[in-house]
Amino acid sequence: MIRVMIADDQGMVRTGFTVFLGAQSDIEVVGEAADGAQAVERAAELRPDVILMDVRMPVMDGLEATRIIAQREDISARILILTTFDLDDYVYEALRSGASGFLLKDASAVQLAEAVRVVAGGDALLAPAVTRRLIREFARLGGPRAPSTRRLGQLTERETEVLVLVSRGLSNQEVAGKLVVSEQTVKTHVGRVLTKLGLRDRAQAIVYAYETGLVRPGD
């Protein structure tokens, strides 16, 4: 059973998502939060697997709450950012903060449930279109922030190649076509990249690739 918490300042949104998810046999909504501070508190108390996190909330916004939760060793929840807004303003910062992906608030019940399953399973819900927005935002912010590049040396040539292509916005299927390998092989390579670099998911890997300068906007 996937344990989900919903953090949104609109009661109707929380209720709607609870109804949608409650109809799924493998998902249980264990709690709600009406602002970011409450989200942090309840996440520590309830230990959900996935948190649906609104961005614009009172007291503490969703980005700050995401950052705090991601840094807490006693909370292992994955975070899906809920949005009705254009992502350009905060896609990069949300991913740097520890979000595992984005979900539009008007997503269908099927899309909502599938998004929860994807993130709970350890993957990132990050469409190539969102990756391209991330790249543009990174370019606007001025390039590498110079974290340690030492771990990149642990990657094989093929793993580095896969990381570069993923970071340029290609889907697993597109990477597979470019490298003439199966999609499952690409998934295996991505998994090894995450393990070797000590990263949580695809979203973190893309941010890491740009921050180390492995990939640069416009390459």
Question: What is the predicted function of each stretch?
Answer:
Residues 46-52:
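Active-site beta3 strand of CheY-like receiver
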Residues 57:
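Receiver (REC) domain active-site loop signature in two-component systems and cognate sites
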Residues 8, 54, 83:
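Active-site residues of response regulator receiver
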Residues 26-34, 42, 199:
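Short hydrophobic/Thr-rich beta-strand motif most characteristic of the beta2 strand and flanking loop
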Residues 53-54, 65:
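Active-site T/S-Asp motif of two-component receiver
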Residues 35-38, 60-67:
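Acidic catalytic/metal-coordinating carboxylates
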Residues 91-96, 101, 106-157, 161, ...:
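Short, flexible helix-to-coil linker/hinge segments that flank and couple to helix-turn-helix
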Residues 169-204:
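Recognition helix of helix-turn-helix DNA-binding domains
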